[in-house]
């Protein structure tokens, strides 16, 4: 799983649950859960929406890790 994310940590910082985060981002709670678990890689559009919610860059939330 080369795409790591810090979504859960950022979500905790602003005190929203997965359902509320999904509403803010325009997706379901299940999608947020899948992203946090690393089971789903968001589209570029969704990654940008999520970053905008936290007023940070996409790279602050999502990291690409090279496979060795």
Predicted feature residues:
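Short basic helix-loop element that most often maps to the first helix and adjoining turn
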Residues: 5-24
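Residues in the recognition helix of alpha-helical DNA-binding motifs
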Residues: 10, 24-25, 35, 64
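Recognition helix of helix-turn-helix/homeodomain-like DNA-binding domains
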Residues: 27-41
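Short, conserved catalytic or interaction motifs in soluble domains
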Residues: 37, 56, 66
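DNA major-groove recognition helix of helix-turn-helix/homeodomain DNA-binding modules
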Residues: 45-60
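Short, charged recognition helix plus adjacent turn
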Residues: 62-68
């Amino acid at each position: 799983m080369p795409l790591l994310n810090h979504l859960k940590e950022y979500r905790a910082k602003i005190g929203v649950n997965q359902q509320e985060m999904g509403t803010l981002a325009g997706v379901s709670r299940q999608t947020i859960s899948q992203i946090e678990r690393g089971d789903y890689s968001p589209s570029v559009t969704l990654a940008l929406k999520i970053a905008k919610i936290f007023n940070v860059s996409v790279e602050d939330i999502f990291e690409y890790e090279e496979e060795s």
